[in-house]
Amino acid sequence: NEVIGKTWTNHFMAFKNFITSINNNLQHVIEIGCPTNKLLKLFNNYDSWTLLDPNALTYDTENILSINSYFDLSFNISNKYNTIINSHLLEHLYFPNEQLLRFNDLLLDNGDLFISVPNMEYYAKTHSPFLGIHFEHTYYLNVVNIIYLLNKNNFYIKNMLYFENHSIFYHCKKENNMISSIDLVNQYNLSNINS
């Protein structure tokens, strides 16, 4: 099955390889939305790693900090990070625009944001128009929407990689003086819906 099982193991390894091919010295990392800590277990090239998730596992080591909390609009942390990593989180955020702006605030200048999101467009076209949108995935994320949200919140997409038909990996840089100019185009013809 392309959405469960071994696919997830392969996904995490591919995402780790994507990240380390770009930055092999992550320094100070915050991973947001990480209940299983599968990514952390694959890395050894960091100075400190903060896990932020309501169910984050606790580690008895000085350079790994677990924060059991949601990354919602009330969450507050004073630390700044070189790297933010999240996998299959963006589609779960209730306020993606505001929360991406918070990502930007958490990053040091020129910091890296690595995200993995489901390839909703593929699933919508090949399986069901609503596959991927449900009570946990409350809005539709395609490449155009993601580019728009990232640019609007001062992230410049440096690299993008499709992992099979399962996920899309993004590497973004924080850009403080970015001028965002993107038009959202209606890609769907709904004129025949009542025919």
Region locations from a protein language model:
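A short glycine-rich, Lys/Arg-flanked "PGG" loop and its adjoining helix->strand segment in the class I
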Residues: 97-114
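Short, glycine-/aromatic-enriched active-site segment of Class I SAM-dependent methyltransferases
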Residues: 115-139, 143-145
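Conserved S-adenosyl-L-methionine
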Residues: 155-165
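Short catalytic micro-motifs in class I SAM-dependent methyltransferases
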Residues: 87-94
